[in-house]
Regions:
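Short, flexible beta-strand-to-coil junctions
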Residues: 8-14, 27, 65-69
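A short, exposed loop/beta-hairpin motif centered on an aromatic-Gly-Thr core
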Residues: 16-33
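Short aromatic-glycine-(Arg/Gly/Cys) micro-motifs in beta-strand/loop hairpins
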Residues: 1-20
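Residues marking helix boundaries in flexible regions
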Residues: 5-7, 29, 54, 84
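Short, mixed-charge low-complexity intrinsically disordered segments
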Residues: 37-84
Length: 84
């Protein structure tokens, strides 16, 4: 039987320092709560740094410094994963 887990993926690269995490949840409500708190922080940081916010939806947030995406960006995604 397949189980579906909700995963929040959070990646931040700031001047070539990479931080990546993937946190699983069995509850969509808890995953959304965690996702929203991370996005709130990342949105605030992006605005302070004058980064371009490319995507800001219920399941994805992406922001980056203009012209320096590979060095300075933030990405947060809420997604479902099937585990066999």
């Amino acid at each position: 039987m397949e189980k579906i887990y909700i995963v929040v993926v959070h990646q931040v690269e700031d001047f070539a320092e990479l931080a990546l995490s993937a946190k699983p949840f069995s509850s969509i409500d808890k995953a959304k709560e965690y996702f929203n708190s991370i996005v709130e922080d990342e949105r605030s940081n992006a605005n302070k740094k004058d980064w371009e916010i490319e995507t800001d939806t219920d399941v994805c947030f992406c922001a980056f410094e203009e012209g320096r995406y590979t060095e300075n960006h933030s990405f947060v995604e809420l997604r479902e994963e099937e585990i066999n």
